[in-house]
Amino acid sequence: MNKSNSMNNTSLERLFQQLVLGLDGIPLMDVHWLIYVAFGAWLCSYVIHVLSSSSTVKVPVVGYRSVFEPTWLLRLRFVWEGGSIIGQGYNKFKDSIFQVRKLGTDIVIIPPNFIDEVRKLSQDKTRSVEPFINDFAGQYTRGMVFLQSDLQNRVIQQRLTPKLVSLTKVMKEELDYALTKEIPDMKDDEWVEVDISSIMVRLISRISARVFLGPEHCRNQEWLTNTAEYSESLFITGFILRVVPHILRPFIAPLLPSYRTLLRNVSSGRRVIGDIIRSQQGDGNEDILSWMRDAATGEEKQIDNIAQRMLILSLASIHTTAMTMTHAMYDLCARPEYIEPLRDEVKGVVDASGWDKTALNRLHRLDSFLKESQRFNPVFLLTFNRIYHQSMTLSDGTNLPSGTRIAVPSHAMLQDSAHVPGPTPPTEFDGFRYSKIRSDSNYAQKYLFSMTDSSNMAFGYGKYACPGRFYASNEMKLTLAILLLQFEFKLPDGKGRPRNITIDSDMIPDPRARLCVRKRSLRDE
């Protein structure tokens, strides 16, 4: 028996030598590399198999270049062609249902005429946060806490939004301080080229930290650094893991530098939040952390639970807001004819009553400009994202099995005259489109930047619309207003509006672009 085993082993060794060694006995590859290549080949085939799988929803799929294009290639192309694929589908089907294939999932695209049908399901049968968690591998990026309860939504809706009018002076105070730290020093009449995208992130980070942590802790540099790093590491980690089969994610994730950075951010964030909670005495603090601590019940009260929610809320409130603001700054500099009318409006409001509780509500033109900029350059091309956990059949007979992910092509809709109000064609940028319509008292509230309806879902729609949109709107209007009063902005000589970068179904302002800034002086008044 031992002899037989010895012979078999010898035979296997010879076979292996023939495969690995050349005729001259020269190694073709190291044994370890053979193992790596074999594993890599298996992994590639497995990934292609996963990318080639598709949903069972029987509606047209858009994006294929030909009948011969493999599904895995279409999913990869969606990363950089997502915007055009969605637009192609909307233009072709418009009022009927279609689907797109992206990395990790298929998305059934619902036109607005079906919205009332699909939004009727109760929250236990549909989750609007789940698509975000899935896209960014929430199990590894610590996003699963949002699936456990809606503590953060309760705090925003019940505590933050009712307090917004009293927060204007608080936010302005922190913005004034932030400008001294984040705008570079410059001489009178000196134009300085700046990275406006990064500046916006830092300005919004500081304002948000004031609202999130209160005046005593908002300038904690560890927290400010963490919130900036966390978003970047989460995005990179989630994007990479999206193409990795679930069975391999526990092994691949620890190898990613971004994942290790993310874990460090989470650990640091827990420490900061824990220290603040332990240092707080009694009630009366007017900040999100205090409200969240007071509203938490059961497991929500755990420091780790609260800290993770604070990190994700910071991600949502800072980076989408900063990108929207960067888009608006690019639009403003590309269309300088809007600068003086907007500045005059801000001056008129402030001269009349200062930054009182109603100041931001009276900036009608500024509100309109931000809404029009968002119409052209939304951060998200698809909104009303949700996953259904109950099978349903729509009025046209389309069956959506349990587990179906749906979304609305909000950006494509906002390029369609059927969904864009006013006499100016939707293909033309009209910064005062909405303020002109709102001059009619019948539409005074309908076309606010923060308002949503079935034609404009940039912030979502209905009870699942972004709960923080009213805060974000005020933050953006305040920031743009102060910048207009204190600075001049323009594009570098010979440059046009920076082109947007579309990644998957997101529209990102070019982070490489620069703007020129100059302090305004008394003679500019």
Swiss-Prot record:
Top-level division of the source organism's lineage: Eukaryota
Entries under Gene3D superfamilies matching the protein: Cytochrome P450
Location(s), subcellular: Membrane
Catalytic activities: ent-kaur-16-ene + 3 reduced [NADPH--hemoprotein reductase] + 3 O2 = ent-kaur-16-en-19-oate + 3 oxidized [NADPH--hemoprotein reductase] + 4 H2O + 4 H(+)
Cofactor annotation: heme
A Pfam family assignment: p450
EC numbers, comma separated: 1.14.14.86
Keywords for this protein: Heme, Iron, Membrane, Metal-binding, Monooxygenase, NADP, Oxidoreductase, Transmembrane, Transmembrane helix
Alphabetized InterPro entries for the sequence: Cyt_P450, Cyt_P450_E_grp-I, Cyt_P450_sf
GO biological process, one term: gibberellin biosynthetic process
GO cellular component: membrane
Its membrane topology: Single-pass membrane protein
Residues passing through the membrane, by range: 31-51
GO molecular function: ent-kaurene oxidase activity; heme binding; iron ion binding
Metabolic or biological pathway: Plant hormone biosynthesis; gibberellin biosynthesis
Name of the top EC class for this enzyme: oxidoreductase
Binding-site residues for heme, renumbered to this chain: 466
Function recorded in the entry: Catalyzes three successive oxidations of the 4-methyl group of ent-kaurene giving kaurenoic acid, a key step in gibberellin (GA) biosynthesis.
UniProt miscellaneous comment: This protein is poorly expressed and has no detectable ent-kaurene oxidase activity in this species. Consequently, this species does not produce gibberellins.
PANTHER family: CYTOCHROME P450, CYTOCHROME P450 MONOOXYGENASE AN1598-RELATED
Family: Belongs to the cytochrome P450 family.
Full protein name: Ent-kaurene oxidase
Organism of provenance: Gibberella intermedia (Bulb rot disease fungus)
